[in-house]
């Protein structure tokens, strides 16, 4: 399989808009939960792992927020309370603010 071609639409990766369309259809929830020893974790949920590269988005968020994090069960977990900054970063990345809770 040629890695330069999108498996969904069959267009070259440079012309593919599958991810842009997927961004408009996502219903994303950003919430903060407490974990062991009172540590806070920001959880970004509602992303479709088949249409959005969660590892790439996680790497972007961790780099911009200067925090640790992981991808678990189709959600992104970031160490610390970053709810407002995550919403701003997601909108700068092309996600609609109306679809982010």
Curated annotation (Swiss-Prot):
<keyword id="KW-0810">Translation regulation</keyword>
<dbReference type="GO" id="GO:0003743">
    <property type="term" value="F:translation initiation factor activity"/>
</dbReference>
<comment type="similarity">
    <text>Belongs to the SUI1 family.</text>
</comment>
<dbReference type="InterPro" id="IPR001950">
    <property type="entry name" value="SUI1"/>
</dbReference>
<dbReference type="InterPro" id="IPR036877">
    <property type="entry name" value="SUI1_dom_sf"/>
</dbReference>
<protein>
    <recommendedName>
        <fullName>Protein translation factor SUI1 homolog</fullName>
    </recommendedName>
</protein>
<dbReference type="GO" id="GO:0003729">
    <property type="term" value="F:mRNA binding"/>
</dbReference>
<dbReference type="InterPro" id="IPR005872">
    <property type="entry name" value="SUI1_arc_bac"/>
</dbReference>
<keyword id="KW-0648">Protein biosynthesis</keyword>
<dbReference type="Pfam" id="PF01253">
    <property type="entry name" value="SUI1"/>
</dbReference>
<dbReference type="InterPro" id="IPR050318">
    <property type="entry name" value="DENR/SUI1_TIF"/>
</dbReference>
<dbReference type="GO" id="GO:0002188">
    <property type="term" value="P:translation reinitiation"/>
</dbReference>
<dbReference type="GO" id="GO:0006417">
    <property type="term" value="P:regulation of translation"/>
</dbReference>
<dbReference type="GO" id="GO:0001731">
    <property type="term" value="P:formation of translation preinitiation complex"/>
</dbReference>
<dbReference type="InterPro" id="IPR022851">
    <property type="entry name" value="SUI1_arc"/>
</dbReference>
């Amino acid at each position: 399989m040629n890695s330069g071609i999108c498996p969904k639409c069959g267009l070259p990766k440079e012309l593919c808009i599958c991810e842009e369309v997927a961004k408009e259809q996502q219903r994303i929830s950003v919430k903060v939960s407490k974990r062991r020893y009172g540590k806070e974790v920001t959880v970004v949920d509602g992303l479709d792992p088949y249409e959005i590269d969660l590892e790439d988005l996680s790497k972007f968020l961790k780099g911009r927020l200067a925090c640790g994090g992981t991808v678990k069960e189709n959600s992104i977990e970031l160490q610390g309370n970053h709810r407002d900054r995550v919403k701003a970063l997601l909108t700068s990345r092309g996600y609609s603010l109306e679809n982010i809770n």
